[in-house]
Amino acid sequence: MIWFVNLYVKIVTRVIKLKHSDDEEFQLKFISGGMLSTSELSLLQAKKEIALYGQRTQRMFGMVKDLVHEKEGSETFSKIYSRIEKYEKISDRMELEIAAYLNQVADGRLSYDGKLQVSAMLTMTTEIESIGDSCFHLARTVIRKQEAKVEFNEGIEKDIDLMFKLVSEALDNMNLILDKNDMAESDSVSYTHLRAHET
């Protein structure tokens, strides 16, 4: 029976590693297949992609927090910084791809309300990318702190932890709003297509 448990552990560990690896590779989940049959459906897919973008960026911020609390110069410290650096590149590419997709949607047949949605979604994408940039700049600041051999006292560390807590809460709220917008739009589009099919 023990051999079965060991095999199970190996399988689970491998699956977790694969998921972890996939998440750190550039890939679009909802808009990689191109435009859909209607502009409304295309916008819905873009909203889902933006929501995923927000989640990835929040994960990146969590890495910065881990970096700050990790022992400087350790192997784990270097690995975390490398992950942040990789996420920053992914963030840049996601912004470009989402923006290109939205511009393609805007070039098609789109209502005035739809054009306003595209404009708002482009702004969201730019702001999320800016958060990713800020995360990377924070990580680089931690590296410079290490190189300069600067030490923070207990008071400064508490203030930094408080700021991390507040920003984490803000990102939680941001992603909650993005998810709610996505769900509301999904329900609306589904109902519209159902009514169209009935008539």
Predicted regions and their residues:
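Cytosolic, long alpha-helical scaffolding segments
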Residues: 1-195
